[in-house]
Curated annotation (Swiss-Prot):
Domain text: The BIR repeat is necessary and sufficient for LAMTOR5 binding.
SUPFAM superfamilies named in the record: Inhibitor of apoptosis (IAP) repeat
Compartments in which it is found: Cytoplasm; Nucleus; Chromosome; Chromosome, Centromere
Keywords, comma-separated and alphabetical: Acetylation, Apoptosis, Cell cycle, Cell division, Centromere, Chromosome, Chromosome partition, Cytoplasm, Cytoskeleton, Kinetochore, Metal-binding, Microtubule, Mitosis, Nucleus, Phosphoprotein, Protease inhibitor, Repressor, Thiol protease inhibitor, Transcription, Transcription regulation, Ubl conjugation, Zinc
Major site of localization recorded for this protein: cytoplasm
Annotated site location: Interaction with FBXL7: E126
Cross-referenced SMART domains: BIR
Modified residues annotated as Phosphoserine in this record: S20
Assembly and oligomerization: Monomer or homodimer. Exists as a homodimer in the apo state and as a monomer in the CPC-bound state. The monomer protects cells against apoptosis more efficiently than the dimer. Only the dimeric form is capable of enhancing tubulin stability in cells. When phosphorylated, interacts with LAMTOR5/HBXIP; the resulting complex binds pro-CASP9, as well as active CASP9, but much less efficiently.
Protein modification: Ubiquitinated by the Cul9-RING ubiquitin-protein ligase complex, leading to its degradation. Ubiquitination is required for centrosomal targeting. Deubiquitinated by USP35 or USP38; leading to stabilization. Acetylation at Lys-129 results in its homodimerization, while deacetylation promotes the formation of monomers which heterodimerize with XPO1/CRM1 which facilitates its nuclear export. The acetylated form represses STAT3 transactivation. The dynamic equilibrium between its acetylation and deacetylation at Lys-129 determines its interaction with XPO1/CRM1, its subsequent subcellular localization, and its ability to inhibit STAT3 transactivation.
The protein's name in its UniProt record: Baculoviral IAP repeat-containing protein 5
Length: 142
């Protein structure tokens, strides 16, 4: 069974798959935050036009940008998301029992739902603020 037959979210448990996301990563050789080390710390590369070095933990979904060549990915991950369960896994993912893996993935899924819920709440609050302003402007016209 190859990695391609795994669901996309589960493919991210494989370090090589995470490494493959680091296209056009600005820090390659002679740096602490190489693609290999970033992937080992759980990060995937998800650049934007304004944030070419944006990396996100596939597990806790913490996003970090503004990397410096001497930044240690594991230490940065611990500093900004110390509760990430990925950081405490002692086995290679290929060595986990099915029960261990599913328990771990349940935590990842909870993190994903929390992140998506938080994003939707922010989006709703921004929309509500715009609507409130529009209503106030209409009321001022009367």
């Amino acid at each position: 069974m190859g990695a391609q037959s795994l669901p996309p979210a589960w493919q991210l448990y494989l370090k090589d798959h995470r490494v493959s996301t680091f296209k056009n990563w600005p820090f390659l050789e002679g740096c602490a935050c190489t693609p290999e080390r970033m992937a080992a710390a759980g990060f995937i590369h998800c650049p934007t036009e304004n944030e070419p070095d944006l990396a996100q933990c596939f597990f806790c979904f913490k996003e970090l940008e503004g990397w410096e060549p001497d930044d240690d990915p594991i230490e940065e991950h611990k500093k900004h998301s110390s509760g990430c369960a990925f950081l405490s896994v002692k086995k290679q993912f290929e060595e986990l029992t099915l029960s261990e893996f599913l328990k771990l993935d349940k935590e990842r899924t909870k993190n994903k739902i929390a992140k998506e819920t938080n994003n939707k709440q922010k989006e709703f609050e921004e929309t509500a603020k715009k609507v409130r302003c529009a209503i106030e402007q209409l009321a001022a016209l009367e």
